[in-house]
């Protein structure tokens, strides 16, 4: 059966490769976006936000996407050694770096022949707002089997911070950089198990933490124009023998990462290394809320301004789910997308207290 459409009926079209990296979606946009001017990838990202954010919304939000959709826009690179520039995006905005998105993008570039492919390994370099992302793709019979990425320098920024969240009390956290700034929170201190059933609770608390931290804590990367904490990473012990710890990362419009989060793994390893709890060249296996795994490694120590950091390596796999053409119909009243419940509000204090009490009870029953 042959199926075609009349291009003249539509205002704009985009072509994408859809994939997931250990459960977390990456929609790779390779055609349809206007050229983004800028001398740096950060400038290109800012131009996208100020001029073409409606296209981001059209591709990330319903009906083409959903609250937890994630995307990667391919652009010409700024640095000559890079194969492609990439700007990561989600339902809430754009990000400077993404580990799972880098793994997904490198995998799909190999499987679609958009880079020169050699076996058993193909090196792909991505130019992101946070810096160059070097990936090594393990290739077998044309298929990307596994990807290792060397991330940008990661470092522990602030240690043993505390913040008062109404209904939860004082919560201790670290701030660590792994491509974006993360607030690292031990979920066991608040008595919430990291499970798929508890994601709504973690999402609401994560957004409360993001708001309060960014209102009260000054943030400044030593070199990059990054001045906010963009993600909250809840972590805890795991019962999975192959994993060292597990996490759930909250970001964007209360999105929950289905993968272990590459930048989050980098941020956590940097914190562990700074505290003397992780040695160089020691595998660190991180489990996601869905049970999928990333393997990380601190490859070497570096200085990031006044901070002692690491160069993290993250390894995982991605899988193609589709090749798509997306159309914008000028007669469609929802042409540029929508998001139900855009502002996830915190529950009332009585509800929060009930949630925490129930979580504590569940935690102690299991423990």
Regions found by a protein language model. Give the residues of each.
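Glycine-rich phosphate-binding loop plus the immediately following alpha-helix
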Residues: 182-183
